[in-house]
Amino acid sequence: MKSIVFVALFGLALLAVVCSASEDAHKELLKEVVRAMVVDKTDAVQAEERECRWYLGGCSQDGDCCKHLQCHSNYEWCIWDGTFSK
């Protein structure tokens, strides 16, 4: 009878350790996924900034500005060029 109780308690302790380790691994995996998402989002924003300048972004010529924007000659920032097409 004592051995059955001992085996049961040992099994429960082992199960608790395995579940705890699994939970820690799950938390680490979740942290890595969140970090990857944040890094990807940051890289995407930087890529957009490199491709073209948004509204009121600094520029030196029309080619620096995004679609439907033009470089204002006096203030050197991107403004709307008056077009609506997609």
UniProtKB/Swiss-Prot annotation:
> Carries keyword Signal?
yes
Q: What is this protein called?
A: Omega-theraphotoxin-Hhn1f 1
Q: In which tissues is it expressed?
A: Expressed by the venom gland.
Keywords carried by this UniProt record: Disulfide bond, Ion channel impairing toxin, Knottin, Secreted, Signal, Toxin
A Pfam match: Toxin_12
Could you tell me which cysteines form disulfide bridges?
A: 52-66, 59-71, 65-78
**Subcellular localization(s) per the UniProt record:** Secreted
Entry remark concerning the domains of this protein: The presence of a 'disulfide through disulfide knot' structurally defines this protein as a knottin.
Purpose of the protein: Ion channel inhibitor.
Question: Which chain regions cross the lipid bilayer?
Answer: none
Residues of the propeptide region, as annotated, are: 22-50
* UniProt record similarity statement: Belongs to the neurotoxin 10 (Hwtx-1) family. 17 (Hntx-9) subfamily.
Give one GO term, molecular function aspect.
Answer: ion channel inhibitor activity
N-terminal signal peptide = 1-21
GO CC, alphabetical: extracellular region
Query: Mostly located where?
Result: secreted
Question: Where does this protein have coiled-coil stretches?
Answer: none
Task: Report the source organism.
Answer: Cyriopagopus hainanus (Chinese bird spider)
For this protein, the record's PROSITE patterns field holds:
HWTX_1
What InterPro entries does this protein map onto? Answer: Huwentoxin-1, Huwentoxin_CS1
